[in-house]
């Protein structure tokens, strides 16, 4: 058989197409992973910290907390070795939260690589006030802080400014949904609207600053800031290659992208059980 046929196709056999392009794969994609068992083997730890993990795993296997509730174990009194062991085991997942509390303390919350498990630490200055491991759709401090903001009144509307296009009707739409919980969740997608910088400034003045900042990672990054209005969040999604992807106002108790799904909690309970079993088998006798 002639070899000519086999040279009609393949690399280098076709003319270049200058118009061809391919979107590069996102370089910011991160997914949950298993804890490094090799690293855990090198971490000294006490039976106390293993008992805490077993307690949380048992609670989670018996009962999945409903929205607004969590299961928790206290880590505040762990020694330095146990704290390092917990840090190695939990790692860092996709969601980070920072909350400025009314008493001038600050809550720092990091989702673990076990989706729906949250490391919750509260500090005042250099002093650590709380250190907990929580299991739930969202950490308790976030649920509590998200319901403390103001409800709107008509007097909240800031005076009009030059350059407004859609700011005023968007403000009325936003306030109408905040006042009516049955109309939530609701999203106002600024990316798909003709909107000016004056509109953005007007809406920002309407909502005011909040005390919660959230960052999520995955395909790009999302920055979600609470506003001064209850259940109103300003969301910006970016991609390191393409820049801004989405800007919106979300009217809801907590944006869905932050929440762990029930099936995530089931999976994390199973994975945590496997880790606890491995630790028990690896323990010296």
UniProtKB/Swiss-Prot annotation:
Keyword 4Fe-4S: no
Stored Pfam families: HupH_C
Transmembrane segments: none
UniProt signal peptide: none
Residue segments, region Disordered: 1-21
Swiss-Prot/TrEMBL keywords: Nickel
Gene3D superfamilies the UniProt entry points to: HupH hydrogenase expression protein, C-terminal domain
Keyword Nucleotide-binding: no
Family to which this protein belongs: Belongs to the HupH/HyaF family.
Role description: Not known. Could enhance the incorporation of nickel to the hydrogenase.
UniProt protein name: Hydrogenase-1 operon protein HyaF
Organism: Escherichia coli (strain K12)
Gene expressing this chain: hyaF
């Amino acid at each position: 058989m002639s070899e000519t046929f086999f040279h009609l196709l393949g690399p280098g056999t076709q003319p270049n197409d200058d118009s061809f392009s391919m979107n590069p794969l996102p370089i910011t994609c991160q997914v949950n992973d298993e804890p490094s068992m090799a690293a855990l083997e090198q971490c000294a730890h006490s039976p106390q910290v293993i008992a805490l993990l077993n307690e949380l795993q048992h609670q989670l296997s018996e009962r999945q907390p409903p929205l607004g509730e969590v299961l928790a174990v206290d880590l505040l009194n762990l020694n330095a070795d146990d704290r390092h062991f917990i840090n190695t085991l939990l790692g860092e997942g996709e969601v980070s939260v920072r909350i400025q509390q009314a008493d001038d303390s600050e809550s720092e919350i990091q989702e673990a690589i076990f989706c729906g498990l949250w490391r919750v630490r509260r500090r005042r200055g250099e002093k650590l006030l709380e250190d907990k491991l929580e299991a739930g759709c969202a950490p308790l401090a976030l649920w509590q802080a998200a319901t403390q903001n103001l409800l709107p009144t008509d007097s909240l509307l800031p005076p009009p400014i030059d350059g407004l296009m859609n700011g005023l009707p968007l403000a009325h739409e936003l306030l109408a949904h905040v006042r009516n919980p049955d109309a939530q969740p609701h999203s106002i997608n600024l990316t798909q609207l003709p909107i000016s910088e004056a509109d953005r400034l007007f809406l920002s003045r309407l909502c005011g600053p909040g005390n919660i900042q959230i960052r999520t990672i995955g395909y790009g990054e999302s920055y979600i800031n609470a506003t001064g209005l209850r259940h109103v969040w300003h969301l910006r999604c970016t991609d390191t290659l393409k820049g801004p992807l989405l800007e919106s106002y979300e009217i809801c108790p907590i944006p869905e992208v932050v929440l762990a799904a029930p099936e995530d909690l089931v999976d994390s309970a199973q994975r945590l059980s496997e880790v606890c079993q491995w630790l028990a088998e690896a323990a010296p006798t």
